[in-house]
A protein has these predicted regions:
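Bacterial N-terminal signal peptides
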Residues: 9-18
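Extended ligand-binding regions for polar small-molecule ligands
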Residues: 26-35, 72-80, 138-141, 148, ...
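Extracytoplasmic small-molecule ligand-binding "clamshell" domains
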Residues: 26-110, 119
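Short helix-initiation/N-cap motifs at beta->coil->alpha
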Residues: 35, 71, 86-97, 142-144, ...
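Bilobed "Venus flytrap"/periplasmic-binding protein-like clamshell domains
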Residues: 48, 52-56, 66-79, 133-186, ...
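Acidic, polar ligand-binding/catalytic clefts
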Residues: 75, 79, 84-149, 217-219, ...
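A ligand-binding cleft/hinge motif common to bilobed small-molecule-binding domains
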Residues: 94-97, 110-119, 168-171, 192-193, ...
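Periplasmic-binding protein-like
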Residues: 129-136, 203, 207-250, 268-276
Length: 276
């Protein structure tokens, strides 16, 4: 008798779930859509982009406006979405916490995909690739031509804090001293002042510096010594926004738009007159 009552109860619960399940799932789906970053952007009419200044990813021109590869990417994304774009300059060391607290909608700032970062944020498919290189002082690093030459306790490297350049320096030149700076420009100024042996940074900025200050600086190695995928970063749990961003990136890649923009900003100096 008790077994019969138990089975009857199970049957009633199953029937109840079958009737209410679709409705509940529909409500849950609607709630998720309402709370998605994509929906918030469309309602607000503004795409808020977190970024920091890195030449030539993002920098200010002579009039004080932001220009650069990432700036073009974010502007085109906003245009295709039918919204305006708002850039939120943020110190790199605190850019992920700022995203997580809702200061902006997405990071479009040359952020490399890293395991520790991926534990805090979700990354889209890559829209670009970058790599680490070095520019060195002729006075302090004359004759240096390999990572081994810089992997010495007396060598000092200037690096922007919070960047993948810090990890690259630790991995490939663990013996060298690392001097960290909040701003990329400060690191390069320290190199030009002759206070460090080299700057470790994302290509192509080191090559630009070596060409601009060829009397005092040089490239110890012709090629990058790392390669890393670059992606948008967004808050976890936002599936709709992730799918949209991935689709947009793939479309722009298939159209050749991303490749054209990459060549302009990284393969030429046609933009130099905007900032110099």
């Amino acid at each position: 008798m008790k077994k019969r009552q138990l089975w009857l109860l199970v049957l009633m619960v199953a029937v109840s779930l079958s009737l209410t399940g679709p409705a509940f799932a529909g409500k849950l789906q609607n709630q998720l859509v309402k709370e998605s970053t994509l929906e918030q952007i469309l309602k607000r009419g503004v795409l808020r982009v977190g970024m920091d200044t890195f030449v030539p990813w993002a920098m200010k021109d002579k009039t004080g406006k932001f220009v650069g590869f990432e700036i073009d990417v974010a502007k085109q994304l906003a245009e295709d979405m039918g919204v305006k774009v708002e850039f939120v300059p943020t110190k790199w060391a605190g850019i992920i916490p700022a995203l997580l607290t809702g200061k902006f909608d997405v990071i479009i700032g040359g952020m490399g995909i890293r395991t520790k970062r991926a534990m805090k944020v979700n990354f889209t498919i890559p829209y670009d690739y970058s790599g680490m290189s070095m520019v060195a002082s002729k006075a302090k690093a004359d004759g240096f031509s390999s990572l081994e030459d810089f992997n010495k306790s007396e060598v000092e490297l200037a690096i922007k804090m919070g960047t993948t350049a810090v990890m690259a320096a630790k991995k490939f030149m663990p013996k060298a001293k690392r001097r960290l700076f909040e701003d990329q420009a400060q690191a390069y100024q320290e190199l030009r002042n002759g206070n460090v042996h080299a700057v470790v940074g994302s290509s192509p900025r080191p090559a630009f510096e070596a060409a601009k200050y060829s009397e005092t600086l040089f490239m110890p190695m012709r090629d990058n010594f790392t390669k890393e995928p670059i992606a948008f970063a967004l808050r976890k749990g936002d599936f709709d926004t992730m799918v949209f961003f991935n689709g947009w990136i793939q479309t722009k890649r298939d159209q050749g738009w991303l490749q054209d923009k990459h060549h302009y900003w990284f393969g030429t100096r046609d933009w130099a007159h905007l900032v110099e």
